[in-house]
């Protein structure tokens, strides 16, 4: 049998009798079997070669193991002995083979094999000169290490190697042996080890930004790989991007957050070989002074991505993309669309995509005014460390900035409002992580930062320091995340703060409510939020207040609490500062969550726990004697007598309108209406009863509106600043004005969704009355409930499975939604066996225009400007949301649904009704998909 590594004959030099077990003798035994040609290698050894009839009968009679082994030695012929010894030899050396790398190509495999043989021969010869058993073992280990180092360019785990190169390495090994080798558990384990050793950017950690001293190197066109979930949206591709012919079909499927391609982990190397890179996000320092035309075109051109499945409309013919169902072995998989990952332009690949688009300059689409182009983001050259020992080590601790954002002339029409995004993935359950991935698709991934992996916003703020005059900031998180960014800006000493918008993903979101962004971000596409930042915002200001704490030395504590602190957790207040019962409940909740973080890991659980603790405190009235331990002065006026008169349990210093998750404690009266930028803070008082009544529309007791507050405490009292509670020792607290920061306040103007902008120019016509040529189609109408919508709005296929079909309407594809509402409402009223009582305030659901993000409700105010084809696929169904419709869980508990009776359909005109088909006929479909520019029926 011939083996992969040519084991040479060992030198004829004889050694003493004491060196009986040496590497030389082992090599001689191996070479003896290697010189004997294999007579029947192509056939696997059968069991009858090892056992005779005598053995079988002996085994049946209870023959012991020693006698069976002796009979085997008698029966085995000479070839069998050699074959067994050869297999044993292979197991001795296979560990060295498995450590070799995958970079060696099949063309130079013979040359590399000779080099490996020569190096192994010299290694074995040198090892044979050892003088003891211990030295022999050491020589064998060094030989294996030498093999790994000198020929570290092979890997049995590589599929190409197991199929092609193993055949060249082992020409006399039969196919079944090579297949068995490829399926061995050792090979599978080695492949898994190699996969884990390569860094995969699963959640955009700090490795995406900071290069370590290892082998990892950040590339300008690096993919941002994420776990691919099947059916995540109506337009999510599930086919491997390398193609059906080259796909290895092994490994976990991952999806790039920046360009939305899908590939197996074992196909990543093929993507690099085929030059299927992601969109370029930055440029290197080497191309700064004299950039070539090729590098400039690569930074400013489109980044086209092929799609097997796509929603929306073609930018050339304005027709939707017909989805194809792929059946294994029956239809060839073809790409139906091509889209740019920058500007999001989409075209039919066969008829509508022009070749000159490949060299066209990309304008970055509807969000071009906030997308930071890759020509602006510069990666600086690495600084080499000096060999000299620094005389002052402290001066050399300053970290080196690896990236910097600087406007250049390469992009003449740069963004007027570049956006810097900070996302807290832990906020809002899974919403923060999903927002991070969606923003990487809509914007440049290099302008979106995970605030937790980088341990704060400092890295991103320093990177964008040179564009501070144009910069806008978007904070995706709660009020605490906003305060984190503002405090970091204070530490950086910026001369001016950029205006800040908020995506509310926290629990309370009172600051987001005050700025017009709402209390919960759940029913709006992120692309629409980006449009709102551009067109629906004004710059306002937010007051911030400084809190100084000094110990009250005149007060002697009788007993000290272990949790008592001498300073507040925050020194700058943005939302509110409270003393007493409110802070006591917050402190209890903080301790409960710290002790059991797994029990309080969602917004709903937090609200339930907070409400339960508040209810307990309502009856206990823990701080009913608060007025006995504090002295309060507002603008130099002592208001302590009023606190004692009202017997307050809580004192609140309020800066914004909302408090405790959307309540308005000051009231909505026009007199002395509070403002977040008037330079004054509102002082209110509560009892435990009025605190509980806030959630039902109650108000607090107004004490004062002032610009300076002084509080003296004579006892350790719980306090909280912007939701951060603590038990503060007796202190003298002074609250004064700190600064004003600009904020982006959202004001509802005109709708600015991409649908509305597209409809005006779809066919190049504006408000001109042209005879409609749209077809009357039979469109099924299905209804879903609110609970199912909240659970499955990110997965359209799963949401559709929970729906119930209420009937069919005959409607024009370009009919407006308000006219379709009349037809559907009539269908609900005339339904004979509807299993629930419908609500008149049902809503349309849009699963087409923002399919990359999920399904969203359509506002009633937008129904007169959106058509049926804008919110649904006319080949599938029209989806509506009814709050009265029971969820799928309730339907499983109660059998509501009976066999549906025939339902009369309604139409928008006197056209004949179609009873033989539920959808548009195949003939009309062919006409619509033809190459004709216009079709008249």
UniProtKB/Swiss-Prot annotation:
One of its GO terms (molecular function) is ATP-dependent diacylglycerol kinase activity. GO terms for biological process: diacylglycerol metabolic process; intracellular signal transduction; phosphatidic acid biosynthetic process; phospholipase C-activating G protein-coupled receptor signaling pathway. Keywords: ATP-binding, Kinase, Nucleotide-binding, Transferase. Residues 414-551 form the DAGKc domain. Residues 116-129 have a biased composition (Low complexity). It catalyses: a 1,2-diacyl-sn-glycerol + ATP = a 1,2-diacyl-sn-glycero-3-phosphate + ADP + H(+). The keyword Kinase applies. Residues 44-69, 106-145 are annotated as: Disordered. Belongs to the eukaryotic diacylglycerol kinase family. This is Putative diacylglycerol kinase K06A1.6. The lineage of its organism: Eukaryota, Metazoa, Ecdysozoa, Nematoda, Chromadorea.
